[in-house]
Swiss-Prot record:
Job of this protein: One of the proteins required for the normal export of preproteins out of the cell cytoplasm. It is a molecular chaperone that binds to a subset of precursor proteins, maintaining them in a translocation-competent state. It also specifically binds to its receptor SecA.
InterPro entries assigned to the protein according to its UniProt record, in alphabetical order: SecB, SecB-like_sf
Biological-process GO terms, alphabetical: protein folding; protein tetramerization; protein transport
Assembly and interaction partners: Homotetramer, a dimer of dimers. One homotetramer interacts with 1 SecA dimer.
Name under which the protein is recorded: Protein-export protein SecB
Lineage of producing organism: Bacteria, Pseudomonadati, Pseudomonadota, Gammaproteobacteria, Vibrionales
Gene of this entry: secB
Cellular component aspect of the GO annotation: cytoplasm
Gene3D superfamilies named in the record: SecB-like
GO MF: unfolded protein binding
Pfam families hit by this protein: SecB
Keywords annotated in UniProt: Chaperone, Cytoplasm, Protein transport, Translocation, Transport
Family: Belongs to the SecB family.
Amino acid sequence: MAEAAPQEAQQNFAIQRIFLKDVSFEAPNSPVIFQKEWNPDVKLDLDTQSRELGEGVYEVVLRLTVTVKNEEETAFLCEVQQGGIFTAEQMEAGQLAHCLGAFCPNILFPYARETISSLVVKGTFPQLNLAPVNFDALFMNYLQQQAQQGEAQA
């Protein structure tokens, strides 16, 4: 009888929960800003953070901050922290880093984008549709920067 080959542990990824962790909307120059011609200058800042909650369970938080200026005055400032709890088991360190730094933010981004769009409309500003973000490219840039910093310190 042939011996059974040892089974490798299977990778496991699952979404446990997606939640809104923090939200803020400010329109410091309203209502005066509504009387001006609308020619917005949009600035988007984003950041991701992750932490282990338990064995193979991680929280990932995507923070988006949108600042819109019109004629050099702040029309509105909107910040959303979209969180998710994910199961990520049996992954090598590099795979896990990519999962938490790119794959999970890709999952969270549409939720954060919709929240921002909704808040902007509720502030009676024209709808803001954020373009998709390539988190894979951002993650690769991050890895390259880390490698360059490591070489510079060596």
